[in-house]
Amino acid sequence: MDKVKKEKLEKKGWKVGDIDEYLGLSPAEMTIVEMKVALAKALVAKRKALGETQVSAAIIAKTSQSRYAKVEHADSSVSLELMIKMFFALGANKKELLETLSA
């Protein structure tokens, strides 16, 4: 958000901040959230690059479509470990994982 817009909102009584402030997340927790979001985006991109649907990607990853959808949306019930396993199941390698998480 640009400075002018932020100032206008604050003058109208709105409180402006970051998501970590709003949710009360520690720096470590915010890093985990950012990693999950980056990995979810990479999973969608990988699946689409392979020409797979969520159903076919779920079959490849040996899970259900609904669970796979939760992974692609970085649902809070999904662990980072599960997201990584599914990324590898779609053919990603360590280099792709590290590039995704360091971006």
Q: Which ranges hold each PLM region?
A:
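Alpha-helix N-cap/N′ positions at the starts of helices
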Residues: 38-39, 63
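DNA major-groove recognition helix of helix-turn-helix/homeodomain DNA-binding modules
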Residues: 79-97
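Residue-level detector of short coil/turn "hinge" positions at structural boundaries
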Residues: 15-16, 54, 94
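Short alpha-helical DNA-recognition segment
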Residues: 50-70
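Short basic helix-loop element that most often maps to the first helix and adjoining turn
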Residues: 12, 41-56, 85
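N-terminal flexible/basic segments that precede or flank functional cores
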Residues: 1-38, 99, 103
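Short, conserved catalytic or interaction motifs in soluble domains
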Residues: 73
